[in-house]
Amino acid sequence: MINNKSKYTNLIKSEAKRLGFLSCGISKAGFLEAEAPRLENWLNKQMNGQMSYMENHFDKRLNPTLLVDDAKSVISLLLNYYPSEIQNTNSYKISKYAYGQDYHFVIKEKLTALLHFIQTEIGEVSGRAFVDSAPVLDKAWAAKSGLGWIGKNSNLLTKQVGSFYFIAELIIDLDLEYDNPTTDHCGSCTACIDACPTDAIVAPYIVDGSKCISYFTIELKENIPTEMKGKFNDWAFGCDVCQDVCPWNKFSKPHNEPLFNPNPEVLSFTKKDWEEITEEIFKKTFKDSAVKRTKIGGLKRNINFLKD
């Protein structure tokens, strides 16, 4: 006879798949002991740059039971965003995750639907949905639940589909069956370390966030340091270099989420189009996109830095 834990686990994983998630793994909620010294060391070395929010909620980042009362399980989910088409080659580049609609809203809707399903099918279950704007170590939880391993570029990797996916969590007060971590398959490969244009991967598995092109083009609010001149390889919003060169991403398959399909302008814009972008065109093109985070001023700053 199937036990309830197994039954509920299978129900949840089946519904996650129906909602379009690539995969679903489950871990027992608790303190992430191995992550505590890593996070502390990373912050002490100021690898978060001006991302001061990374210093907030230190204890909550490591322990989901402080985020959700009586938390029992962390459900980790992956949502593919690998596009079927990429930008015009004569263009300033934006990270592939920003081609379509802002993932925060797309994922939150799916997580809300999954939680509603759990409450309808199983009963009184409390929980919270988390996308990457919340203090949850999403990659650590995804790795703990066997969805992949954390690679030398600090991204979650899988043998089946590489790393072009979003990670999200649902933390609930229900005991479930838990998955086991997988093994690291980076081996002796250093492709990501060798390819990083700004040497942000300072050691295997350690990324200095304050040296990353994504940090400079999205998080940094002041002028980009002049010593970075000529190193950005035309990246105007984010950077995919360490993922593009990863051998496991040869197995990436296009997503099937219509909301992640790009606005045609995103693919067709030339450098001239980007350089001449107006507030009106910016708002029209990126009104539902993660690119709006930089605002028109931030995007123009990035383009001027690349152009000069």
From Swiss-Prot:
Assembly and binders: Monomer.
Listed cofactors: cob(II)alamin; [4Fe-4S] cluster
UniProt-annotated catalytic positions: 132 (proton donor)
Gene Ontology CC terms, in alphabetical order: cytoplasm
First-listed, main subcellular location of the protein, grouped into a coarse class: cytoplasm
Pathway where this protein functions: tRNA modification; tRNA-queuosine biosynthesis
Domain of life: Bacteria
Binding positions ([4Fe-4S] cluster 1): 186, 189, 192, 246
Gene that encodes the chain: queG
Catalysis: reaction(s): epoxyqueuosine(34) in tRNA + AH2 = queuosine(34) in tRNA + A + H2O
Pfam assignment, any one: Fer4_16
Protein name: Epoxyqueuosine reductase
Gene Ontology MF terms: 4 iron, 4 sulfur cluster binding; epoxyqueuosine reductase activity; metal ion binding
Family per record: Belongs to the QueG family.
Record SUPFAM superfamilies: alpha-helical ferredoxin
InterPro entries named among the record's database cross-references: 4Fe4S_Fe-S-bd, 4Fe4S_Fe_S_CS, QueG, QueG_DUF1730
Function, as annotated: Catalyzes the conversion of epoxyqueuosine (oQ) to queuosine (Q), which is a hypermodified base found in the wobble positions of tRNA(Asp), tRNA(Asn), tRNA(His) and tRNA(Tyr).
